[in-house]
Amino acid sequence: MIVLNRLRLGTVVAFVALSLPSAHTLAQSAQPIPSPSAPALRQPPNVGDAKAAATAYHDSGEYGRDLAVVTSEAGAWIVQRGPQVSRPALVLDIDDTALTNWEVIKADDFGRIIGGPCDALPDGPCGWAAWDLLGKAPVIEPTLRVFQQARSLNVAVFFITGRPESQRLATEQNLRNVGYEGYAALHMVPEATHYASAAAFKAPVRAAIERDGYTIIASMGDQPSDLAGGHAEQPFLLPNPFYRIP
């Protein structure tokens, strides 16, 4: 019995020894188990990063260079097409097309603050309506050159803006002060009128200009909604990563 028990004990010990994992096996099992492939994150760009990138784009000169590219193309088209049409016309937006609002954009940290005063620039906040009434928006020089080029070729220039009619005097004064003189008309949103989008107002105005006998050979704006809806032979979209108008 004693021998038998010893044999059995030896068998058990041998079995246990064979069953225990080796040091190599233990080391392998200590490695982290790879997780299943996770789907790509779908979050949009970080707002703070986007604002920093937009500021760098403006201040580095890239914005100005891109403006020059688009306006040069517009000018070349007007020179080519203008003499071929009996009553050629150019349509221009105002805000961040003919005049720059960068001072307000920066002061408001890219917010779109419509109401309130604007009396602390370069600090904010600055209400856009109050800013428009100041009539101090600087010119966008490349657009002014296109305007002057068009006028030298007897191309009629029409401004169509989302600004309300109540800002007409300040807007006309601002345009005149920076060099936009001799345009055919300034179309503004009637008081107490709401449009679902900028295009809902601007496209019908362009259609009315055509009904008056003009051929709109070019339309230029900084928002896709400035150009949507047709009634222009060639649209020219200026860069604007700073805000979006539907």
Task: Annotate the PLM regions.
Residues 2-4, 24-92:
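Non-catalytic pre-domain segments flanking phosphatase-related domains
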Residues 10-21:
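Bacterial N-terminal signal peptides
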Residues 30-34, 40-41, 45, 61, ...:
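C-terminal cap/substrate-recognition subdomain and adjoining C-terminal extension
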Residues 63-70, 74, 139-146, 167, ...:
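Stable alpha-helical elements in mature extracytoplasmic
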Residues 73, 77-84, 97, 101, ...:
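Structured segments of extracytoplasmic/periplasmic soluble domains
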Residues 82-89, 98-137, 152:
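Active-site neighborhood of HAD-like aspartate-dependent phosphohydrolases
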Residues 91-93, 159, 220:
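Short hydrophobic beta-strand that contains or immediately precedes a catalytic carboxylate
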Residues 130-158, 165-166:
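Short, acidic loop-to-helix structural element flanking the phosphoryl-transfer center
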